[in-house]
Amino acid sequence: MLRFATFIIAMMAMSGIAGAQSFPADILNTPVDGSVASWIIRTFGLLTVLSVAPGILIMVTSFPRFVIAFAILRSGMGLATTPSNMIMVSLALFMTFYVMAPTFDRAWRDGIDPLLKNEISETDAMQRMSEPFREFMVANTRDKDLQLFIDIAREKGQTVVVDEKVDLRAVVPAFMISEIRRGFEIGFLIMLPFLVIDLIVATITMAMGMMMLPPTAISLPFKILFFVLIDGWNLLVGSLVRSFI
C-alpha cells in the first residue's frame, strides 16, 4: 500500500509537470522583480492540474466498472443507503489496486524509480509511466469504441495513431465508454434475479388483494436473503476482477 500511495503522489506531481511544461522550475519561489500577478497565475495553474490529477488517474483504471456495478446492485436490491457510498467507493478502490497492481508496478519500475534516481528526465518518465496504462486501456477497450475516436480525429484532420500506437487522446475516452457499457451489462445481469423476485412478490400480493401494500417492502428481505445464500459478494467481486484482461 505504501508503494501505491507513493505512486499516486508521484503521478499527481508528474501530471502537474506534464500539464505545465511551460512553467519555470522556480514556480514556487516568490518573484523578486515585482511580477506577482504572473507568479500567482502560474501557481494557480499548477495547483489546478494537480487537483485534477487524482480524477484522471481513477478514470484510466478499473475503478468505473466497479463503482457502476456496485451502484446498480444497491439499486436492484432496493437499498437506498446500504452499503454506504463510502463503503462502496472504498471497496472499489481496493479492488482497483488489486487489478491494477501489475500496471502500477510496471509504471513504477519503468518511470518513477528511474526518475527518482535522476536517470531519466521528467518527460521521459511521463511517457514511460503512461505506456502501461495505455496498454491496459487498449486491451480492455472495444475496437468499435476506439475506432470511433480515431475516425473523429481523422475527420478533423488530426492524427492519433503514430507508429501503430493510438494516442491517449483517443484511448482514454474510448476506454471510459467501454467501461461504462460493461458496467451496465454487468448491472443488467445483477438486476435480473431481483426483478424476478419483485414480480413474484407483486403477483402474490395482487392475488391476495393487498394492492395498497408496496411489493418492495415485502420483497426486500427475500432479495437480501437470496443474495446472502448464493454468496453474492464473492460471485460479484470474482466476476468483476476476472472480467479484466
Curated annotation (Swiss-Prot):
It comes from the Bacteria. It is a multi-pass membrane protein. GO terms for cellular component: bacterial-type flagellum basal body; plasma membrane. InterPro entries: FliP, T3SS_IM_P. Its main location: membrane. The chain crosses the membrane at residues 4-24, 44-64, 84-104, 186-206, 210-230. GO terms for biological process: bacterial-type flagellum organization; protein secretion. Keywords: Bacterial flagellum, Bacterial flagellum biogenesis, Bacterial flagellum protein export, Cell membrane, Membrane, Protein transport, Transmembrane, Transmembrane helix, Transport. It is found in: Cell membrane; Bacterial flagellum basal body. Signal peptide: none annotated. NCBIfam families: fliP, PRK12797.1. Belongs to the FliP/MopC/SpaP family. Plays a role in the flagellum-specific transport system. This is Flagellar biosynthetic protein FliP. It comes from Rhizobium meliloti (strain 1021).
